[in-house]
Amino acid sequence: QAPSYAPQPQPQPQAPASAAAAETAYLPPVGQHAPQPQAAAPAAAATAADPEGDGPAYGPATVAGNTRVTDAQRARAEGRSPIIEPGMQPAALTALLGLLLAGTAELGVYGLLVPLVVLQGVTAAGWFRLNGMWPARQGIALGFAGALAADVAVLAAGREHAPAAILGTLGVWVLLSLVLQLRSHADPDERMYGLMASVAAAALAIVATGYLAAPPDAVAVGGAAVAVAVLARSLPLPAAASVVVALLAAAGAGIAVGGMTDLGAKGALLGAGAAVCALIGHRAASYDYPSRFVHFTAGVALPLSAAAPVVWMLGRALG
């Protein structure tokens, strides 16, 4: 019988496996060192959302700088002078309001009452904002109500008794402001500061009633003189030169408008006196890094309100 042999296993070809291993030998391992953009993005967002330290958080970059920084804040940060003058736009509004007072004075007291009430309201609001107290609805309403009460008192008493009507209203409103501040639960220093601001706002708004008590010719000259003086003061000139130009321009306006009325050349004195008070009010509205809101309230109204007593007194004396 012929011997039988078991089949011997045949070796498998290794070339294809070796080629595949060679092709994958230098491929990077999957899942170990590949970049992870999804994980990096939240990390970057977290880093951006959490600024270093306790420093201030800044807004997004803009082409023209940070729009939230006002001129007053920039001047304070740079250590510049706290005096920032209102500029030409508030001066133009002051001139417009002054010309309205001058134009409506010849229409009678009720015609004059419309721009006067606007002046008194802006005066009360501007003084509170100038003192950094905002919102101050109660104080503004109190000062404006005092001005309206003074207007009614002058209309009821007549121009002959206008000083008593104005001073009486002012005394009542000072007492009322004191009572309201005593009822406040704020700190003593804060109450005193609020009392002074309330009394000053009411006083300035009430004093503006002097236009209602002054002769119509004096109101016409005074309103025109203040308008010209404030515009001249806002010209791009050195401070001393602009003051001189403003006073001379106001005196010239007084002569021009006085020539149309019974005051004549005496209008120069009234115009110069009104301009001096207007420039004081203009300077007050420029103090302590004022904002644009201050410029468009106190900067508009204070020159005219400050000139009202002089317009009344010189109008009575020269008329």
Enumerate the predicted regions with their spans.
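Internal active-site segments that recognize and position negatively charged phosphoryl groups
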Residues: 181, 185-259
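N-terminal membrane topogenic signal
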Residues: 79-93
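Cytoplasmic-side transmembrane-helix entry/capping segments in multi-pass membrane proteins
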Residues: 134-145, 165-168, 189-200, 241-250, ...
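Central hydrophobic cores of alpha-helical transmembrane segments in multi-pass inner-membrane proteins
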Residues: 98, 116-126, 146-150, 173-177
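Intrinsically disordered, low-complexity repeat regions that act as multivalent interaction hubs
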Residues: 1-72
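C-terminal transmembrane helix-loop-helix hairpin of multi-pass membrane proteins
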Residues: 53-56, 238-319
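Structural signature of hydrophobic alpha-helical transmembrane segments
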Residues: 102-119, 159-174, 209-226, 264-276
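C-terminal ends of transmembrane helices
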Residues: 121-134, 175-190, 227-240, 279-292
